[in-house]
Design a protein with these regions (language model features):
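Hydrophobic alpha-helical transmembrane segments of multi-pass integral membrane proteins
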Residues: 133-163, 167-194, 316, 346-380
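Extended, low-charge hydrophobic alpha-helical regions
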Residues: 30, 91-115, 119-132, 174, ...
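Juxtamembrane inter-helical linkers in multi-pass membrane proteins
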Residues: 103-107, 111, 161-193, 275-300, ...
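Membrane-embedded alpha-helical segments of transport systems
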Residues: 189-194, 213-230, 249-262, 366-372, ...
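Selected transmembrane alpha-helices and immediately adjacent juxtamembrane segments
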Residues: 58-63, 67-155, 247-358, 439-466
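Juxtamembrane helix-loop transition segments at the membrane interface in multi-pass membrane proteins
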Residues: 98-100, 154-173, 197-214, 235, ...
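Alpha-helical transmembrane helix bundles of large polytopic membrane transport and channel proteins
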Residues: 1-51
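Transmembrane helix-loop junctions at the membrane interface of multipass transporters and ion channels
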Residues: 224-250, 426-434, 455-465
Length: 466
């Protein structure tokens, strides 16, 4: 009886550890492997193939794409090519769209003047709202129209499941679920949608890990900031295709930092607040298929690009108008925006930023897409959003306000690591039904962004590089 009572009192962790010693850790993989080999043997004996090269093509490709040696370099190479094409292909369309909005703004301004509309009304609607919408469309639409279709082509071809297979090993070591790699991949498009995609993870603990760390993957709203900073400062000493290549390399480096941070935070949480044993799952690798290129491009453009752009415009319009009001309502000789900026400036300087940058991130909480327009508007003495059609003009504006390469680096790091946008936070609350976890999803990346930028600033100054 005493022995029976003692066994009843055994802690759950001990029982799990004891059960794991009774079988190999990869027994599930062994079972699935045996099933696959038996099925292949039966097919080989009973089915005749006229084209054996096509039969084994998937296996030959998988040996390369899922190789422990070549899998990750190929993955980074493909990602670099996507970013290179996105950056190189988006420049001209962005300039054309910006010029169109500048032309339209002139006509609208003439119409307001002819109608003798009040200056404040023209300021809110044209210099604030209309320019804000124009900035968002010109900066976001061309990259999205290139990035999303290419990403969709990889998905339809069957490559993304191979990426998940490669990442599964890393996520398992960090205490997370392998399916988190799929939700992380979706975060490249939109973190808010990626939060909903975490439903594919059955374990509540591992699903919470995916929710809390998904923000470290840069979404489409943060690509413009990363690309702009990388091209203006990190690739400043290069021209032509080399500048584009360096810019793409820096952006890929930021993505790698985001993935490392995802794995690190997942590991820490799995050892502290979200303790548990990682669950196993079998990832089915579909055969490689030739994608329907035109259909994929059209669907990706309409379903993803236009949807994200529409959401950005809906959020950017009122935010741009609000920023114009803050910049043009004065108490004495100082605008409300400048009071806010001056309040933030001492703390922001510790992070290698300034009050304008930190204010732009805070006011850009509704959507990351509007951080750049708000930042540019805040720097201008006129208090109006500027057109984003001349990168040299933008760089000169930054340099006049004391920017260095360290400022650009910390702006990129803060953009990569800081709190989720408003839409993502709403989705997190809907999925978790918990104010506590929603707050933690805001606080964890924010604290990490502050620590990382602070340390990078202190290190660079200590080394005397700035």
């Amino acid at each position: 009886m005493e022995s029976h009572s003692a066994s009843k009192a055994l802690p759950l962790d001990y029982i799990i550890q004891h059960a794991q010693t009774l079988s190999k850790e990869d027994i599930r993989d062994d079972i699935v492997g045996d099933i696959y080999r038996t099925s292949a043997s039966i097919c080989k004996e009973s089915v005749q193939y006229t084209n054996t090269d096509k039969l084994y093509r998937s296996e030959k490709l998988d040996k390369i794409f899922t190789s422990p040696i070549w899998g990750f370099p190929i993955m980074l190479g493909i990602l670099s090519i996507i970013f290179y094409l996105t950056i190189a292909g988006a420049n001209v369309p962005s300039d054309m769209i910006a010029e169109f909005f500048g032309w339209a703004e002139g006509y609208l301004t003439s119409w307001f003047q002819a109608a003798r509309a009040p200056e404040w009304l023209h300021g809110i609607l044209i210099l604030g709202l209309f320019r804000g919408i124009g900035a968002v469309i010109s900066v976001m639409l061309p990259p999205m129209a290139i990035f999303f279709p290419m990403f969709a082509l990889l998905e339809n071809y069957g490559y993304l499941p191979r990426v998940a297979f490669n990442m599964d090993r890393l996520f398992k070591r960090s205490g997370a679920h392998g399916k988190q790699s799929l939700t992380m991949a979706m975060g490249f498009g939109c973190n808010a949608a990626a939060i909903m995609s975490t439903r594919i993870i059955e374990s509540p603990r591992e699903r919470m890990l995916a929710i809390l760390t998904n923000n470290f993957v840069p979404c489409n709203g943060r690509w413009p900031m990363l690309i702009l900073m990388a091209s203006l400062f990190m690739a400043a000493g290069y021209t032509g295709s080399m500048q584009t290549l360096v810019t793409a390399g820096v952006v890929v480096g930021m993505v790698v930092i985001g993935v490392i941070m995802t794995l690190t935070v997942s590991w820490v949480l799995s050892k502290t607040a979200l303790k548990g044993v990682p669950t196993h799952y079998t990832l089915e690798l579909p055969p490689y298929r030739k994608p329907k290129v035109w259909n994929t491009i059209v669907r990706a453009t309409l379903d993803k690009s236009i949807y994200v752009l529409k959401r950005a415009i809906v959020v950017a319009a009122p935010a741009a108008a609000l920023t114009w009001l803050l910049a043009n309502i004065f108490i004495g000789d100082t605008s409300l925006l400048m009071y806010f900026v001056n309040f933030l400036d001492p703390f922001a300087k510790m992070l290698g930023l300034d009050g304008f940058i930190l204010a732009a991130f805070i006011l850009g909480l509704p959507a990351n897409e509007i951080v750049i327009p708000i930042l540019l508007m805040s720097y201008l003495s006129t208090g109006a959003l500027t057109e984003i059609d001349d990168f040299n003009q933008i760089k000169n504006l930054f340099l006049e306000n004391g920017w260095t390469w360290l400022t650009a680096l910390n702006t990129m790091l803060f953009s990569l690591l800081h709190f989720p946008c408003g839409t993502t936070l709403v989705n997190i609350y809907k999925e978790t039904k918990s104010a506590k976890w929603t707050f933690l999803s805001f606080a964890i990346p924010t604290v990490i962004a502050i620590i990382v930028t602070f340390l990078s600033t202190q290190l660079v100054h200590w080394l005397g590089l700035v």
